[in-house]
Amino acid sequence: MQSRKGFTLIELMVVILIVGILASVAIPMMRGRIDSAKWSEGKAIAGSVATAIRVHVAEKGSAFTAVATLSQLGFNAGDLTGTYFAGGESGVGDFAWAITDDDPIAYSITIQAGTGITTPSQIVLSEAGVWTETP
């Protein structure tokens, strides 16, 4: 009698079952990581806006503009547009900012969830550098 080498149907089904279970656990975890990576782009853009706001207030003093335009902050029209977030004037794209005081500087930058991002729905950056997420 010849001995056959290979896997039985049961062994192959067990392997497929194990791979399916691992995939069902790993995929939701990876989606959270993907959203987190996409938010990194928005946070980087918000950081640039925060720096521009501090410069704007330092240059203007008490004559600062509460909702400064892109050009007042030193940006061109497409400078705040990324892969996942649409830039533009405050409140037009995914970003909105407001300056409330010059001494000490007080402002907030709100980012709405961009293209293909599920959670959180928005993140706010305060002048203290604190990020607040809204689910």
Labelled PLM ranges:
Residues M1-R31:
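N-terminal single-pass transmembrane signal-anchor helix
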Residues A23, W39, V55:
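Functionally critical, cavity-lining and gating residues within the transmembrane helices
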Residues I16, K43, A50:
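Conserved catalytic core of two-component sensor histidine kinases
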Residues T51-P135:
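Periplasmic/extracellular, small/polar-rich flexible segments of pilin-like filament-forming proteins
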Residues M29-G47, K60:
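Aliphatic-rich helix starts adjacent to a transmembrane/signal segment
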